[in-house]
Amino acid sequence: MDFLFLTFIPSGQPITSAVMFSAGVVGNIMALVLLEVRRRRTSPSLYHVLVTALLMTDLLGSVSVSPVVLSAYAQGKTLVGMSANAEVCSYFGFNMTFLSLSTLAILCVMALERYLSIGHPYFYERHLSKRCGYITIALIYLACVIFCIAPFLGFGEYVQYCPGTWCFLDMSHAEVKGQVYIGFYASFILIVTSTTVVCNIAVLLLLVMMYRRRVSAHSASRSMTEEVEHLLPLATITVVFICCTLPLVLRVYVNLTGSHEERHAADLRALRLLSFHSILNPWVFIILRPSLLKILWRKLHKPQESTLMRGKTLNSAQNSTGCHLQSNTTI
């Protein structure tokens, strides 16, 4: 069945889309509320600006895309059939492409921010501020919008996918311009994801080195805790995003290097995974919120601290006993 021009939904239930929509909206709102509460207790930072932008982008994705799918199921029409010239399909594809690019770009900037704050603190304090974060977010949005309007100018195309409630870039384009466009999209995702992973690994190595240097002095545990609070959610979200985007990148490269035979089931699985990251991101921040991390950090360090205290107590007791015996011998 050719789903490109299908106007009526052949089958399917809106329950999955409704659950995804509810989970995305509720999760992002809860995460934003918790972030605002934390911001009022502490001074706002560049990291908080970037996290807020990430959550707002995910919330925008849930609000702008999911209601369209629910409306399609309610009318029994596909995205192409909901408008005369497939405007709804183009709108849906534009949003999916924009949100995937902007979310990944923000994650990459967050990873770079963490690396600079730990690896190059002097440069970070001197040159980076919240204003840089606002400018960076604006530039990311602008660049993503410019890229996503290219299909309206003849580079690439937004097409409908099975079962008629999904629209995205044509991953099996036969024309050279379309292949270059979708190839650039996949390559950009691959490069930015690799940069994010490298930055996170570098931050992790720096934290391990800091921990080893400071364990012997029993100091700076507070700063270590704060860095772990920032790194753990970022690393988790990066893993989630890789799992959600890598299948789509692989599908694009397979279509570019192989035949142009359409595989609707594989394309649909890749698109569904792509939409999951905006739902999972806020729940990562909710579960790995700083208060919970502090509790876990204290519990992990309590056995070590108690062991150190017992060791100090035994040493002091042995020293006092030795001094007492020595004084008796002298007498």
What are the language-model segments listed below?
Residues 1, 37, 212-231, 291-331:
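Intrinsically disordered regulatory tails of 7TM GPCRs
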Residues 1-30, 34-37, 331:
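Extracellular N-terminal segment of 7TM GPCRs
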Residues 2-3, 76-93, 97, 146-191:
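Loop architecture of class A 7-transmembrane GPCRs
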Residues 9-18, 46-109, 117:
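Extracellular TM2-ECL1-early TM3 structural module of rhodopsin-like
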Residues 17-21, 34, 60-79, 100-106, ...:
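Helix-to-loop junction signature of class
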Residues 48-57, 205-248:
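Intracellular effector-coupling site of seven-transmembrane GPCRs
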Residues 71, 102-109, 116, 122-165, ...:
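Fourth transmembrane helix
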